[in-house]
Amino acid sequence: MIVAVGSTNPVKVEAVRRAFSLFWEADVRGVDVESGVPKEPFGPNAIEGARNRARNALRALNADFGVGIEGGIFHLFGKYYCAGFVWIERKDGVHSTGMSGWFECPEAFLPDMLRGRELGDLMARLSGNENIKREEGAIGFFTRGAVKRVDLYTHGTLMALAKFIAAGRWPR
């Protein structure tokens, strides 16, 4: 089974590999595709970006599954949260979605993010690690490594895989 991830970010590719390998033998490959949304998407744009990444990756590699993971900012209950939205699409067009765990977005970052700055860029400046979004991520920095970005995205991928894992158990 070939699984195409709509990103070459090693964190996203590894998260998908971890999730799929719990249930299937899969050849997980990252591919650079367009998301069609701003670099730091808010709300529905993150969902759209994940969908676009999954579909573009599926086509690019003629894979069995396409997976799009789009980190974004979501506004709920008067606060902004960072989370990853995951869209998984099978080659027959059946899709499923999931989300990673959420954490509150630092208020000090919001003015820059609302102007289009990416969380990863702000975290690079704060942490001194230019590759933070390709490594531990903001959550790894803030939790001192207790939770890493790959953990969040693995969780989100598993949530999106539930429909496919359940197979005959999934209600119709």
From Swiss-Prot:
Cofactor(s) required, per the database record: Mg(2+); Mn(2+)
KW Nucleotide-binding (keyword) present: yes
Binding-site positions, substrate: S7, T8, N9, P10, V11, K12
Binding site residues for Mg(2+): E34
Key words of the record: Hydrolase, Magnesium, Manganese, Metal-binding, Nucleotide metabolism, Nucleotide-binding
Keyword DNA-binding: no
GO term, biological process aspect, one: nucleotide metabolic process
A Pfam family reported for this protein in Swiss-Prot or TrEMBL: NTPase_I-T
Cofactor: record remark: Binds 1 divalent metal cation per subunit; can use either Mg(2+) or Mn(2+).
Example of a GO MF term: metal ion binding
Family of this protein: Belongs to the YjjX NTPase family.
Quaternary data: Homodimer.
Function (record text): Phosphatase that hydrolyzes non-canonical purine nucleotides such as XTP and ITP to their respective diphosphate derivatives. Probably excludes non-canonical purines from DNA/RNA precursor pool, thus preventing their incorporation into DNA/RNA and avoiding chromosomal lesions.
Identification of the protein by name: Probable inosine/xanthosine triphosphatase
Organism annotation: Korarchaeum cryptofilum (strain OPF8)
